[in-house]
């Protein structure tokens, strides 16, 4: 959801973008009005709660924080000196009210001037035909510490405490409804008139296993294709998890690569035939790691054509589960890349790398911005497209990550920064210990790109595909390319920016501790770069505000 408010002269405006768990506020001010501007003071109100000023982690020179326990000061005392601000203390389906004030005066006595007010509602994750939900996972560690201080201290002291021993509230907060969305999709198959076809890399979380077994027990036609690499530990665990299903309901995908799919097709049975109704896909493996620890997405489409393409691919693998070559030939022939359509479902393995070329073309076609979260091992063509040319005019905000390493890109490939992936205490210390020996080396497992987020014609790439050569020609993978859907782009874009801002903040927090970050400017000099023609900060100010 997007809301734009401006004064009658349109020399002061605020554009808001709402995702599922965040709101982004982008401000713009005409150049003559920036004289003496100390920043923006932002108030927030929701429900029947009082209006409150949002906090700033920076203060004016020589000023102590008014809330030292949070290392923060309200923004009417320490105005926010940036033209974009994100609020991630947001729940799905909630209406938020914001007031953005211009702050002038002096560092000793800021004076609030003109203000703009807006209301915006976060996505509830339940739109008619397409919904996405993200767990909170690692990038919510600061909020976790504030919400569950006792548990945070407990898991700091006992890093091997199993997540099953956690209080329900903390566990549910971490998965953020993602597990319920998975289970709810399975439960839509109510009886023998329904079928569930499941393609999964890691089938190990008991809550999901129990939900699938319950569907089978009520007569649902269940088939499970699972990763079955010879001599592989995951294969052994998958087969143990499938013990209650008969052999006719399960087949191992025998591969020397990875059966990396994680999708479920829901079909209605009519005349003995499956009539596909919906598909659940995304990046989430059916493990504690996938649901609670790694950052992941579940994407549900109530789209019969897309569900049919997933079912066709499932049927091909089901028919010849030990013949990866046959699948590769079939996908190459029957799933040609057609990324120009509004909604495209792609699969691999395929020959020739057409999927990778399509990704490069989409990224290179971006006119305004590129948001991304990826792994490190990318083909040069993909990496060069994501990072662009030094000092080009495309805004780039992204992360490359493993469990131990985070590299971020701030507006331009020349502004690379590195942040600590996991701290040693609290939720992150627990995650660090509990991800040891886990399959998969990504902390942020969501694999997604959004191009031209700030425009009315964004493009989203999302799925299990990690943009690598192996994902193109070796692994079984699936992905979606979605064009022109601003509502969906807001959900993905805000989530990618949440990861980005979390690690950007961590990078600055470290510099702050080392006294390498300047305090707030006591005058309007902080605005200078935002008004230099062609500077990336100027482009950011204009584009995010809808200019």
Label every model-predicted segment:
Residues 1-168, 179, 183, 194, ...:
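PLD/PLD-like phosphodiesterase catalytic module centered on the HKD motif
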Residues 186-189, 314, 362-364:
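Short, Φ-rich (hydrophobic/aromatic) sequence segments
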Residues 199-202, 228-229, 372-377:
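Structural motif
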